[in-house]
Swiss-Prot record:
Boundaries of every ABC transporter domain copy: 1-196
Protein name: Cytochrome c biogenesis ATP-binding export protein CcmA
Biological source species: Rickettsia typhi (strain ATCC VR-144 / Wilmington)
Transmembrane domains' residue ranges: none
Coiled-coil region list: none
GO CC annotation, single: plasma membrane
Cell compartments where the protein resides: Cell inner membrane
One Gene Ontology term of the molecular function aspect: ATP hydrolysis activity
Length: 197
């Protein structure tokens, strides 16, 4: 089963314990991570993605410690969008599809987010909102059942926010686990809230 478990996961900064978490996320879970600035929302997502080490504790996905999971085991989109600005929109999507061995999904991502007219554009020529759309199109391109999304709705138009929310619901309905940090109110009624102090 594709469970995600945090076992006594702690983050200590300047002798302050930001969180101490013991929690399991089951398949089809959508969880909004809430908390004030500096409460550790982004750090928690980075830990689960394997980018940052916790102060103590362990993270397990599909019953394996994340250090032993075959990479890439998740799709993480943070403040650094992970797009290559000197490459075109199509080249970026193709690049990610090759990492995840999922080249057949590129056209689906292009169609879903209506990117056809931008395929040959270099990403440095795009607005911050469209760069964000290219980044979240990876959610279709990259075949993973664990999505970690750090304030991805920022700079998105209402249309693209709606497309993103529908995509999240579809992923959850197919058994995926989605964790999102957000300053906005949850518009997904089935979502649960993880509140960091």
């Amino acid at each position: 089963m594709s469970m995600l478990s945090l076992h006594q996961l702690q983050l200590n900064i300047e002798k302050r314990n930001l969180f101490d978490l013991c929690i399991t996320f089951l398949p089809s879970a959508i969880t909004y991570i809430k908390g004030a600035n500096g409460s550790g929302k982004s750090s928690l997502l980075r830990m689960i993605a394997g980018i940052m080490q916790p102060s103590s504790g362990n993270i397990y996905y599909k019953n394996s410690h994340i250090n032993n999971c075959q990479k890439p085991y998740c799709t993480y989109i943070g403040h650094n969008l992970g797009i290559k600005l000197e490459m075109t929109v199509f080249e970026n999507l193709k690049f990610w599809s090759e990492i995840y061995n999922s080249t057949e999904t590129v056209q689906a991502a292009i169609h879903y987010f209506k990117l056809d007219y931008l395929l040959d554009k270099k990403c440095y020529n795009l607005s911050s909102g469209i760069q964000k759309v290219v980044a979240i199109a990876r959610l279709i391109v990259c075949k993973s059942d664990l999505w970690l999304l750090d304030e991805v709705e920022t700079n998105l138009s209402k249309e693209n926010r709606d497309l993103l929310n529908n995509l999240i619901i579809m992923k959850a309905n197919s058994g995926g686990i989605i964790l999102l940090s957000s300053h906005q109110e949850s518009v997904i009624k089935s979502a649960q809230i993880l509140q960091l102090k």
